[in-house]
Each structure stands twice: as structure tokens, then as C-alpha cells.
Amino acid sequence: SIMFSDFAGFTKHVEHMEPKALIELLNQYFSAFDKIIFNHKLEKIKTIGDAYMCASGLPAESRGHAIRICLGALEIQNFLERSNEKREKMRMQRWDMRIGIHTGPVIAGVVGERKFTYDIWGDSVNIAALMEQHGEPGRINISETTYQQVSEIFETENRGSINSGKKGDLPMYFLNRLKEEFSEDPDGIKANSVFQQKFGGLMKIYDA
């Protein structure tokens, strides 16, 4: 499973920012994301400007990779919302993200000679990017294949489809939260003991 995210209206945000302040702010956000995805055993792929990309189910396998990445995305979204609440109290502009997730096969490997980079390629990467591009600020947009693997666990919203050209119509869903019976907190961000009992086996990581 692949997650793409970027800040909505980034160009407008940075027009009046000093370079040092921008770098410090991006570092603050991306460092927080790094901690979140580490806790969910996700693999950071790269950052490009204001975009952040990670994946689940590689390099070590996990049958619950789609669940893991959705839990990570919800926690990232929750972190951003708490951050924006603080910014609004200080009369500062909100920084909202569009997050897109797709589940499917990818090619993964290390490339380069002097500066090695672990990266992923394939149609699944492109579809994850489309999910992000056609999302909304402050929301998590998931594909049909991700939805099929997580709909028993999370509350979702059907959004209809987008036409992707070669791939035809791609159904999309908003991922809102964990279902109440699986949630430890009122916001549906953290999984509870009922979730662990029912889905704990799926969440195991198997070394490749």
C-alpha cells in the first residue's frame, strides 16, 4: 500500500515566508510524520518539496499493510488538525494536507551509485498519486482496492469515480476514522484491544 501526501496551496503559503522559516516548518512536520510512520512500521520512501511518500508491506511483508497505512494516515491527519488548532489561536494560516492511498503491486529497489535511493515504481504508485491529487484538503482519499481491505474496520464515504484515462474509472472513498467498536479514543484514531484481538494476526510483520 502506498501513501502520497502534500500540502494544499503550498505555493501560496510560502510566498511571504523566509526560506529559513519554511525549512524549519517543513522539518517540524516531516519529523513528526517520520515518528508516526515508524510507530506503524511503515517505510518512508521520500519527500519531494512539500510532498511526503511512504509505503506499507515492503521491504518486509505484512498481510495487514493496508490497515497499517490507514492507521498511520489517520494519525498524521490528527497531528495536522491539532497543529492547525494551535496555529488558528495564534492567528496563523492553516496548513492542510491532501492524503491519497492505493493498494497494489509495485517494483521496489535501490538505485544510484553515489547517493543510494530506495524507491518504488509501477501503476500502483501512479494511482496513489491520483488519489492524492483528487482528494480534498484535510481528508484522506483511498482507492477501491484499499477500501476492499479496510472497510470492515474503518468508517468510509463513497465519493464516486474519476476517469484516469488508460485505467478507466477509479472509484474513490474518504477514510474518516476507525469504527467505534475498534477505537480506543472518541476520534477513531487509535486501535483498541478488540481490534488487536480480531486483527492482530494480520498486523504481524514477516521479514522478506
Regions found by a protein language model. Name each.
Residues 3, 20-41, 72-75:
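Active-site-proximal alpha-helical element of nucleotidyl cyclase-like catalytic domains
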Residues 30, 34, 77-84, 105, ...:
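Structural signal for well-ordered, non-membrane alpha-helices
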Residues 1-12, 50:
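Catalytic-site or vestigial catalytic-site microsegments of nucleotide-handling domains
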Residues 13-25, 44, 68:
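Conserved catalytic/dimerization core of cyclic nucleotide/dinucleotide signaling enzymes
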Residues 10, 29, 33, 52:
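Hydrophobic framework residues that shape the active-site pocket
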Residues 106-108, 134-208:
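Cytosolic regulatory/linker segments at or just downstream of nucleotide-handling modules
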Residues 5, 36-68, 82-125, 149, ...:
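Catalytic core of nucleotidyl cyclases, primarily class III adenylyl/guanylyl cyclases
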